[in-house]
C-alpha cells in the first residue's frame, strides 16, 4: 500500500488529521459498538478509517472523491471485510453502502469547502427531511462553523445557521483542534462536535419549519438591524408590535438576540394569523 507522490489537493479541501490523540477523541465521542454501521466522508489516507475499524464496528463505509486516494485506500484495507469504499462526490452520489442497508452513524473529517451543503444533506433543513436519520454525527469542522452551530442567543457567533441546526439537532463540543494537528496545516482552527438529529417524529410541523426558515431569511439579511426594520417587509408595524407584545420580545432587539424557540413561536403566530385570514376570506 502506498500514497507516495500524492500531495494534498487544495481544490478538494484536503487537510489530513495526523494527531493520534484527536483521532482517538473523535472515535470515543462516537460511542461505537459492534452493531454500528459508520459512514466516513473524505477518509483521505485512512488514519481515521483505521481507528474506526479497530473499534470493531460492523461496517465502515467510506466515500472519497479523489480517485488517487481511492486506489490507495483499496490497497491499504483490501483485507478488511468490514470496509467498503465508494469513489465519488458525497454531495451527489448515494451514501448507502453496497449492501443497501443504511448506516446509523457518521464520523468524518469533512472537507471544509463543502461543509454547509454536506451538513444540510446529512441532517436535512427546515421543512425538509434528510434521506436518512442518523443517530449521531461526530464531525471535525472549521471552528467558525462549529461555533455558529453551538452559539447561544446574544453571542457574536449566533446566526440563522444556529437557529436552523438547533431546531433540527442536539449538539455539543468535544474539543478544539489546532492547525498543527493537520498535514498540511489549514489557515483556520477546527473543532470536533457531536450532532444528534432529532427523530422525525420530534420535529416541528413542516409548515411551521418552512415559516421559520422564511423568517430567518428575511430577518438575518439585516443581522445588525433591529427587528422592526428587518421584519417590516412581512407585516405592518402595528401587527409586528402586537406579536412582539404577545411573545414578550422587543422590536428593538436584533435577530441574533432571539432564541430558536422564540422564532418558532413567532412563526406559529404568523401562521395562525394567515390561516384565520384565509378562513374569513373563504
Swiss-Prot record:
Q: Has the keyword Cell inner membrane been applied to this entry?
A: no
Which GO cellular component terms, listed alphabetically, does the Swiss-Prot or TrEMBL entry include? cytosol
EC number(s) recorded for this UniProt protein: 2.1.1.182
Q: Which residues bind S-adenosyl-L-methionine?
A: 15, 17, 42, 64, 89, 109
Print the keywords alphabetically. Answer: Cytoplasm, Methyltransferase, RNA-binding, rRNA processing, S-adenosyl-L-methionine, Transferase
* Keyword RNA-binding (UniProt): yes
Q: Tell me which SUPFAM superfamilies the record gives.
A: S-adenosyl-L-methionine-dependent methyltransferases
For the protein in the UniProt heading, the enzyme class is transferase
* Any Pfam family matching the protein: RrnaAD
Gene3D superfamilies of this UniProt entry? Ribosomal RNA adenine dimethylase-like, domain 2, Vaccinia Virus protein VP39
> Catalysed reaction per UniProt?
adenosine(1518)/adenosine(1519) in 16S rRNA + 4 S-adenosyl-L-methionine = N(6)-dimethyladenosine(1518)/N(6)-dimethyladenosine(1519) in 16S rRNA + 4 S-adenosyl-L-homocysteine + 4 H(+)
Provide the GO MF annotations for this entry.
Answer: 16S rRNA (adenine(1518)-N(6)/adenine(1519)-N(6))-dimethyltransferase activity; RNA binding
Q: Where in the cell is it found?
A: Cytoplasm
Check the UniProt entry and state the signal peptide residues, or none: none
CDD domains membership:
AdoMet_MTases (cd02440)
NCBIfam families under this entry? ksgA (TIGR00755)
> Function of this protein?
Specifically dimethylates two adjacent adenosines (A1518 and A1519) in the loop of a conserved hairpin near the 3'-end of 16S rRNA in the 30S particle. May play a critical role in biogenesis of 30S subunits.
Q: Which family does it belong to?
A: Belongs to the class I-like SAM-binding methyltransferase superfamily. rRNA adenine N(6)-methyltransferase family. RsmA subfamily.
What name does this protein carry?
Answer: Ribosomal RNA small subunit methyltransferase A
Corresponding gene? rsmA
